[in-house]
């Protein structure tokens, strides 16, 4: 990249920006779909926003072996599994949930890109944890 920055520093900058948007004030966490209250999607938390951060965290964990990133990937996965966004018995991945009802309902739409984002992030976490030669990774499997 020009300007003395690396792709890694760009990815880390995006990660830092996104985790600062983690919204603990509603639904016990998660990213809102849009960032400004006047936008129609502000009242939604959706899979692509949270799944994108999950995937980025998992990829950074794999690339850097920094536990901050793997901790965030686990936090995002666990949060999504605690909401209607990701049903961890049927593996239904919903598009969105409403902040107004404390994220207890889901939008009926399912999109393949949401599944792809979650599968990719899960694959990076698998590679980070299970394919690592570090003793810590072997102990946690």
Placement of each model-derived feature along the sequence:
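Glycan-recognition and catalytic cores of secretory/periplasmic carbohydrate-active enzymes
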Residues: 1-141
């Amino acid at each position: 990249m020009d300007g003395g920055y690396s792709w890694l520093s760009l990815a880390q900058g995006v990660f830092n920006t996104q985790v600062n948007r983690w919204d603990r004030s509603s639904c016990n966490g998660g990213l809102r779909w849009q960032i400004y209250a006047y936008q129609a999607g502000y009242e939604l938390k959706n899979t692509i926003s949270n799944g994108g951060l999950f995937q980025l965290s998992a990829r950074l964990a794999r690339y850097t072996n920094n536990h901050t990133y793997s901790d965030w990937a686990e936090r995002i996965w666990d949060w999504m599994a605690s909401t209607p966004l990701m049903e961890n018995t049927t593996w239904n991945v919903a598009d969105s949930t409403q902040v107004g009802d404390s994220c207890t309902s889901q939008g009926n739409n399912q999109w393949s890109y949401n599944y792809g984002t979650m599968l990719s992030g899960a694959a990076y976490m698998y590679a980070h944890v299970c394919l690592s030669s570090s003793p810590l990774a072997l102990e946690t499997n």
